[in-house]
Design a protein with these regions (language model features):
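ATP/Mg2+ or Mg2+-diphosphate-binding catalytic cores
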Residues: 77-158
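Active-site acidic catalytic loop and adjacent metal/ATP-binding pocket
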Residues: 1-39
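Active-site activation/catalytic loop segments of kinase-like enzymes and analogous catalytic loops
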Residues: 25, 31-91, 108-123
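Composition- and surface-driven signal marking solvent-exposed, interaction-prone regions
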Residues: 19, 62, 127-130
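Intrinsically disordered or highly flexible coil/loop and linker segments, enriched in small
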Residues: 12-13, 56, 146
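Residue-identity detector for glycine
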Residues: 5, 17, 33, 44, ...
Length: 158
């Protein structure tokens, strides 16, 4: 399997002017040669877009913090939600429940790795990205508690 290194929605170019679905998209800006190369890293990065809404947060101009509340406009996309579900179903079918769990854990790691950069370079909006990290961590915890990653649970849903 080829490793991209920065597989985000923004790095997938879709074309509507071609009939062959295999040629309707291509990937740009590879970042190969990382110390840790794994398709799980790539899929985790993709989920940072589809699940965590990273690109939508990048377009959100401001957030406010009052006591223990972080307020910002949380943008969701039905198309992203559908793609997120399709990627999770596809990866779960190919990698098993433990593989899907690992991919979602890698998404969380991408959010964790992002925080020092946001705290240094984007201090005013860093709380919003922290909130994104917490939302993803909460989802992962909920799915673990619901048994989403148990092999039998995934098999029963098919």
């Amino acid at each position: 399997a080829d490793i991209h290194g920065d597989l985000t929605v923004e790095n997938i170019i879709c074309r509507t002017d071609v009939e062959n679905p295999d040629k309707a998209w291509y990937i740009i800006d590879p970042n190969t040669g990382n110390l840790h190369d794994s398709p799980y890293l790539d899929y985790g990065k993709l989920l940072q877009s589809l699940h965590g809404g990273y690109e939508f947060m990048m377009m959100t101009p401001r957030c406010t913090v009052q006591e223990n509340h972080i307020d910002f406009q949380l943008t969701r996309s039905a198309a992203y939600d559908t793609l997120f579900e399709a990627v999770c179903d596809g990866r779960g079918a190919r990698c098993g429940s433990s593989g899907l769990h690992s991919i979602l854990a890698h998404e969380l790691i991408h959010w964790l790795r992002l925080m020092p950069y946001k705290l240094n370079k984007d201090k005013k909006r860093a709380p919003m990205f922290y909130a994104g990290l917490v939302m993803v961590a909460n989802d992962l915890n909920t799915w673990e508690n619901e048994g989403k990653f148990d092999e039998k649970a995934r098999t029963d849903r098919r």
